[in-house]
Amino acid sequence: MLQSAEGWIRDFHLDGLRLDAIHAIYDSSARPLLRELAERVHAIRDQVHVIAESGLNDPKVTRPAAQGGYGHDAAWADDFHHALRTLLTGEREGYYAEFGRVGDLAKAYRRPFVNDGTYSTSRGRRFGAPAFDRPVEEFVVFAQNHDQVGNRAFGDRLPAPARPLAAFCTLLSPFTPMLFMGEEHGEEAPFQFFSDHIDEKIAVATREGRRREFASFASFAGEEVPDPQDPVTFEHSKLTGRGDAGLRELYADLLRVRRTLPRGDVDDIVAFDDMGGPQLAVRRGPYTLFMNFADGPVSRVLAPRPNEVVLSTHEARIEGDGAVWLPAQAGALVR
């Protein structure tokens, strides 16, 4: 494994490695494999990015080796996704059951481990650890990815009405954003779970294991869940290139504006749960991200009072009393 990682960087000149499910690697050695891997590839080229997926909410992943960590450059942050998706869609099945409060997303904007040593109801135990010693840039956040879409029974992407606000929340966060293929133009094709196992025993185990893992989701109860081994499942998942030109333009605008925002920790966060639903205000220097997750419009006075809408997902305005008006499921960057 170590030589393979070195080869990808040295011989094939990749600019980074993404390590899958490192929480499933059991290693009690004095010099952990994951630490040595990062050391070896960084020795070849300093600017190589080692990005880990860990289901443990453990800041040790990105801590330097000198501090007892693995020295990876970044780590995925699933809790940010869960906190965001549950507000956008109202889903509460399975591991989403312990999310859904606007306070969860407010906490995630500080550091995206919502479970940071707190009790996890889906796991039945305390989970995670605080990560305030790690800079925000080390956390990779997303509104969709291959796991969160592909692990759904039918591979359905985020509902279209939720996509603009999801993009706003993710791309204007202080963290490192990741886009899922076709997300930026509202790709119409699903991304279903597909496989091509030659061994029938493994194929059967894949089907059964998938249903078992997601048994708490009602959509997995029916017999119509696509068969991972059926070639049609793979064909349905191919990108079409069709989508929403307006959404693509919004993504471009968000990425442009992101470059102007101050780097580092956010300055202030205020969560609201009135006026018909949850809202969140996140201040970054002179800018405030105002997000309305409610099913109806809101008008709220923010502090400090803004006088300009820099960018918004939908129509937004500053009213006479200085309040920011937003329609349902919308976001505005004001200053």
Where are these regions (language model features)?
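Active-site neighborhood of glycoside hydrolase catalytic domains
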Residues: 1-61
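Hydrophobic alpha-helix feature that most strongly marks membrane-spanning transmembrane helices
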Residues: 6, 10-13, 42, 147, ...
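Short amphipathic alpha-helical segments
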Residues: 30-31, 63, 300-303
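Alpha-helical packing segments of well-folded alpha/beta enzyme cores
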Residues: 1-8, 142, 166, 246-258
